[in-house]
Regions:
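A glycine-/small-polar-enriched, mobile loop at the entrance of the PLP active site in fold-type I
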Residues: 39-42, 57-76, 85-86
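PLP-dependent class I/II
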Residues: 1-6, 11-16, 21, 26-35, ...
Length: 397
């Protein structure tokens, strides 16, 4: 009897480096190491009390059975209502919405339904690790496209034009961006939308961090594009309401694509957890309480960001100033012939010698950098940043 051999479906699949980094930190802490985990990509705040209370009421009322694959109608209706308030074109309706088990599933549904063998899809790089793997699982080819550092690594139509070929079928956008925290302006998004429309590309807009911005708004593509004909917008409650474990996201897309994605989901997870859908409905149905909870969280993130940036700049550490999300993207060193992934080496040494867990930039296809999350208690963030500075200075020497 032979052992397990992976199928050809997953032979090239790489596990999520962000999840792996956090799991490693948790394992070391469980073994007694005083590890500071700055690798996690989730808010360190509790789910708002009003959401918890409504979830409890829904549970008592029997919200424990299957729902439609697309999700409960009241939740889809309020998502559509909120999207329509943003959209500059036609009204968004509930039959354009699918509620998913987190935004990750919504993105996978879209990639798997839109792209296939021979298709190329451009991914802003550095970019979230799962974009590349989802496209590969869909048999499409992810094309890493890099922007200039002076633009916070954001892309322009010129960048896209240089990377595109006759096989290009789409583009993934993420603003605010994971891992850099960069936010695209309205003008920047308008230029990209026009460029993509001229070429009949699909745009997948990942807007999960949109509510977490510090220096002005993070525009939704819904407020830029006049039509949703070749647009998929993905969002959820995980980051803006500290509801990562509830696993609720959604997609907004053309009806024909939505039907295809619903068929796909009917054979994978079916509906997202019923209780979680009711919790998400509570979060979206109480705008005043929701705005207060999100504003309080964002205010604390901003204070942490500012304090950490002050320390890093005083030490002359190269860092991209985040305008949104909750990550610091820090230069670990320059790649050389001997050291091709300085970010990976630095992250390993940081954990082994200084008990600080971060995510190496190789996870985001930029091996000279590391991602540091400040979605952790303030004292942990500040002590972790001090250790990063200490390690960086000693490594350079």
């Amino acid at each position: 009897m032979t052992g397990y051999a992976p199928s050809t479906n997953i032979t090239e699949l790489r596990e999520s480096a962000t999840i792996a980094a956090s799991a490693r930190a948790k394992a070391l802490r469980a073994a007694g190491r005083p590890v500071i985990d700055l690798g996690a990509g989730e808010p360190d705040f509790p789910t708002p009390a009003f959401v918890m209370a409504e979830a409890h009421r829904a549970l008592e009322a029997g919200a424990t059975r299957y729902t439609q694959v697309e999700g409960i109608l009241p939740l889809r209706e309020i998502i559509a209502e909120r999207a329509s308030a943003l959209h500059s074109g036609e009204r968004i309706t509930s039959d354009q919405i699918i509620v998913t088990a987190g935004t990750k599933q919504a993105l996978f549904n879209a990639c798997f339904s839109l792209f296939g063998s021979g298709d190329e899809v451009m991914v802003p790089t550095p970019g979230w690790t799962s974009y590349y793997e989802m496209l590969a699982l869909s048999r499409a080819t992810p094309i890493a496209v890099r922007g200039a550092l002076e633009r916070q690594l954001k892309l322009t139509p010129s960048d896209l034009g240089r990377a595109s070929t006759s096989r290009t079928r789409g583009l993934i956008l993420n603003s605010p961006c994971n891992p850099t925290g960069a936010v695209y302006s309205r003008d920047e998004l308008r230029d990209i939308v026009a460029f993509a429309a001229e070429r009949d590309w699909w745009i997948l807009s990942d807007e999960i961090y949109r509510a977490i911005s510090y220096d002005g708004e993070a525009p939704s593509l819904l407020s830029i594009a006049h039509s949703t004909n070749r647009l998929v917008v993905v969002d959820g409650v995980a980051k803006s309401f500290a509801m990562t474990g509830w696993r609720i996201g959604w997609s907004i897309a053309p009806r024909t694509l939505t039907r295809s994605m619903a068929a796909l989901q009917s054979h994978t997870t079916s509906n997202a957890a019923t209780l979680s859908q009711h919790a998400a409905l509570a979060a979206l149905s109480n705008p005043t309480a929701a705005a207060e909870a999100t504003a309080s969280m964002v205010g604390e993130f901003k204070r942490r960001r500012d304090s950490a940036l002050e320390l890093l700049r005083a030490a002359s550490i190269e860092v991209i100033e985040p305008q949104g999300a909750f990550y610091l993207y820090i230069k670990a060193g320059d790649a050389t012939h001997e050291e091709k992934e300085p970010g990976t080496t630095f992250a390993r040494r940081l954990l082994e010698q200084h008990d600080v867990a971060v995510v190496p930039g190789a996870a985001f296809r930029s091996p000279e950098w590391i991602r540091v999350s400040y979605a952790a208690p303030t004292e942990h963030v500040m002590e972790g940043v001090r250790r990063i500075i200490q390690a960086r200075i000693s490594w350079v020497r």
